[in-house]
Amino acid sequence: MAKLSGKTAVVTGSTSGIGLAYARAFAGAGANIVLNGMGAPADIEKERSGIETDFKVKCVHSPADMTKPAEIAEMVALGENTFGSVDILVNNAGIQFVSPIEDFPIEKWDAIIAINLSSAFHGIRAAVPHMKKKGWGRIINTASAHSLVASPFKAAYVAAKHGIAGLTKTVALEVATNKITCNCISPGYVWTPLVEKQIPDTMKA
């Protein structure tokens, strides 16, 4: 299957979990990939080279920090400069912290909003001009069931995911006439390193 041959997908938070699954799915459809995320260098290289070997596409890794707008712009530019286009952007990076609201650390709030919400804005802002130039683009934002409902002790995460839903709708209206779509996916629990830390031992049994 090579429906996306010649196209480039930039996927944030893609060195493990849902993001890596996105990246491998797009590679399986023929797209070149810009991976992004943290991890041990050897582990990242294993995933990067594995994508190239398994799917016969090109794959590079951007270490862009999702709290830094300039680095996010550089990540998008890496796709354009390396592969000639940025056709697909997946905003998937995310972190979590659980605490009662009165004890919620300010720095944790700021970090979650920056990574889970603001990074998507910065990525979209950087990618849309490339997509408009080509007259085609796909933007996918990973929201959550928490973009639809609330959950106690997750004030920042729930606020960010509700924000992702609103951002998605707004961008979709703005870019539709340019043959660019913007959608979000709202999964529930998916067994990833992020979620595993949240599941009580009683639920694992």
Say what each PLM segment does.
Residues S144:
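Residue(s) in the substrate-gating loop at a strand-loop-helix junction
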Residues I124, A160, T168:
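Active-site helix of classical SDR
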Residues T8, T15-S16:
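Conserved glycine-rich cofactor-binding loop
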Residues E102, V149-A156, T177-N178:
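Active-site loop immediately N-terminal to the catalytic Tyr-X3-Lys motif
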Residues P100-I101, K108-I113, M203:
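Substrate-binding pocket helix/loop in short-chain dehydrogenase/reductase
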Residues P129, L173-E174:
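Alpha-helical segment proximal to the catalytic Tyr-Lys
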Residues A29-K46:
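Conserved glycine-rich Rossmann-like NAD(P)H-binding loop of the short-chain dehydrogenase/reductase
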